[in-house]
Amino acid sequence: MEQEETYLELYLDQCAAQDGLAPPRSPLFSPVVPYDMYILNASNPDTAFNSNPEVKETSGDFSSVDLSFLPDEVTQENKDQPVISKHETEENSESQSPQSRLPSPSEQDVGLGLNSSSLSNSHSQLHPGDTDSVQPSPEKPNSDSLSLASITPMTPMTPISECCGIVPQLQNIVSTVNLACKLDLKKIALHAKNAEYNPKRFAAVIMRIREPRTTALIFSSGKMVCTGAKSEEQSRLAARKYARVVQKLGFPARFLDFKIQNMVGSCDVRFPIRLEGLVLTHQQFSSYEPELFPGLIYRMVKPRIVLLIFVSGKVVLTGAKERSEIYEAFENIYPILKGFKKA
């Protein structure tokens, strides 16, 4: 009987030493159990059938506790683990915004023990969009970033004319210039080369040169119209050559107010077009009379360009003052023509 009491006293001393081993810490940083309590042992008849175990508060004095029977690894882990958990929890609380931060149990006065992993899991369930609390792994891409990239609309970096590989080509440029002097058209027609003048038919001298291959209409008022050039530079060069011919004939001609009045371009979209459907859909801008003219006339508002559209896919653009207006008009009309492509 005395031997059993001795064993019981040794067991109680060990339990008391184990209860006094762990330092007091907050329930928030406890990794396993919320409170230190007596461990139920079936060999102890006093505690095996006790349904309400008694909670014991630990003290902070460890001077009287003998820790020699425990290994150093367990003691070191128990000492280091609350520090690591506290450091991780402070980083998570700082990274979270003030509105999304979960209150600690000490603020709510609730005696629940939560470790750092359960806190992060509960926060990720409540706030799935918060990327600060859960860091994505480097092997697995972030699904949120992929979804945002897929939602963002992509705009083409190149104009439509370059995307489809079709660029309108300039076919004719009409320009005007003022020679600023009165002219004798009969004298010009008699002495100039490649010039003709028929006042009953047309009240201007028609003069032609080979390089650049153009035609000029010279009026007695000193105004001149130059047609047939393929570029702006060629049109200006041809007008200067005509003015030089007039100067050599003894007229005080000058070169004033040169201006491009009209540019004509053409292209081929390389597919047949349903003109009947196009004129029904865009009747405000187009007119189509196949008995009078085989092409559809489309009057674009901005830029102010007139387009002649044919069934074969050929398109003529006219009425532009600048080259960019030709390109812009074709970029606007090409998606419309593609919608009326013949099957």
Swiss-Prot record:
It comes from Homo sapiens (Human). It holds the Pfam family TBP. Ubiquitously expressed in all tissues examined with highest levels in heart, lung, ovary, spleen and testes. It is found in: Cytoplasm; Nucleus. Residues 76-90 have a biased composition (Basic and acidic residues). Transcription factor required in complex with TAF3 for the differentiation of myoblasts into myocytes. The complex replaces TFIID at specific promoters at an early stage in the differentiation process. GO terms for molecular function: DNA binding; RNA polymerase II general transcription initiation factor activity. This is TATA box-binding protein-like 2. It comes from the Eukaryota. Residues 143-152 have a biased composition (Polar residues).
